[in-house]
Amino acid sequence: MKKIIALAMLVLFVSAPVFAQKYASINAKRANIRTCAGTKCALKWHAWRYTPVIMVKTNEDKSWVLIKDFEGYSGWIRADLLSPKGGMSAKVDLNVRKDPSASADIVCTVAKGYPFKYLAKKGKWIQVSDEPEKAKDGVCKGWVYNAKLWGFFKQ
């Protein structure tokens, strides 16, 4: 009996960090992700609106947040550029479809890592929309099979 309790406690403590993860999404058209907490730190990459991230930790005054994306890349971002609203990223290059069906017409095709805003869910399909960098590019709005997306949404 003691072994069972000890094993249960071990599982609880080992898995606790998984339950404690906090998610956010980028809330700026384009955000700079840096090597450390500060505008003088080197730029690592850019993240786009709706990109979902895991918040790892903050600096002392909570003005910067260390984030990690779906591929495990990490960097620092100003806290005011994050939102608790959901976002999704394409886990692979994928087709966005007119209706929630693999046989539906393709509306647009996006590359791995492309960020989306969550709109709705129907079965195992997620309705998404983007915010193109240039208005002339048009909005990509449609349905994606949920296994091809990484992220979170608030219902």
Go through each PLM region and give its residues:
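Boundary regions of SH3-family modules and the immediately adjacent low-complexity/disordered segments
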Residues: 21-32, 37-38, 42-48, 52-60, ...
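Periplasmic peptidoglycan-binding/anchoring modules of Gram-negative envelope and division proteins
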Residues: 116-119
